[in-house]
Amino acid sequence: MPHQIVLEYDPEIDRYSAVCPDLPGCASAGVTEAETRLNIEQAIHLFLETA
């Protein structure tokens, strides 16, 4: 089942962050949008694996 993610860019630190609102505490970050998307997908997988 796909999960919604919220992706944000912070120009002050030149980094992206992502959270999954459906999974409390599931968050990640990265230098590029692509890296951040990959990181949050891995975080979601790990979150569900340990739930």
Label each residue range with its predicted role.
Residues 1-14, 19, 23, 38:
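N-terminal segment of the canonical double-stranded RNA-binding domain
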Residues 9, 25, 48-50:
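Generic detector of low-complexity/intrinsically disordered segments
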Residues 15-17, 29, 46:
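Extended rod-forming repeat segments used as scaffolds/tethers
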Residues 24-35:
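A short, exposed loop/beta-hairpin motif centered on an aromatic-Gly-Thr core
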Residues 38-51:
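A short N-terminal helical cap/helix-turn-helix that marks the beginning
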